[in-house]
């Protein structure tokens, strides 16, 4: 699916930066703004697996004022990914995916970064009443100066419940790899920011549920 949007009047923030402080003033302007977006998805069953390809492309052109300097900006991003999952009822549920991303911003300065993301999840029911789950994600960001950050997170759980039994027992292990921080790059309308999120350490939880 392709989408094209053009605006002849836009509301954008007029940005003023003083030291560590930033002041945003929304203003209505006659500056044009154009946006192209293309999204596509193709899936194919191969033997007992399902293969899916995804594409997301976006190009945005707009005018931005920062510290009384007005520039024509381009903010673009492209993502291409695939996923493979089992499609056979007698097999465990397994899904793995990879996404490659490219991001560019030009205006007062030019910058870019790329990303590599892997996601996987697994679910297995065994001995009738037991269910095991595993989730995994990693993300690597690399900027235009070839500097990179990386994080990976894994969560797992095992659940036991008999049929028609109101009791359910489950053990969770969150942040199994004991990752300390989560890093990510993002674009505002005029700059790149690196966000660092501190995450809870590895934790184990025992859950007992009674369903009325």
Task: Give the ranges of each region predicted by the language model.
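Exposed, low-structure sequence patches enriched in small/polar residues
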Residues: 1-212
